[in-house]
Amino acid sequence: MKLFYKAGACSLSPHIVLRELGLDFTAXKVD
């Protein structure tokens, strides 16, 4: 799974959920 995020956006919550569930994901920063 890929998690696309932008600095300063509200993408922290999904990141926390993915980590807590132990799911594998790749975080990809977008401009």
From Swiss-Prot:
This enzyme's EC code(s): 2.5.1.18
Family to which this protein belongs: Belongs to the GST superfamily. Beta family.
Role according to the record: Conjugation of reduced glutathione to a wide number of exogenous and endogenous hydrophobic electrophiles.
EC category: transferase
Compartment(s) where it occurs, according to its Swiss-Prot or TrEMBL record: Cytoplasm
Subunit structure: Homodimer.
Swiss-Prot/TrEMBL keywords: Cytoplasm, Transferase
Name of the protein described by the UniProt record: Glutathione S-transferase GST-7.3
Reaction(s) this enzyme catalyzes, per UniProt: RX + glutathione = an S-substituted glutathione + a halide anion + H(+)
Entry keyword annotation includes Transmembrane: no
Binding site for glutathione: C10
Domain of life: Bacteria
Record GO cellular component, one term: cytoplasm
GO molecular function terms listed in the Swiss-Prot or TrEMBL record: glutathione transferase activity
Record's keyword annotation contains Ribosomal protein: no
Stretches of the chain forming a coiled coil according to its record: none
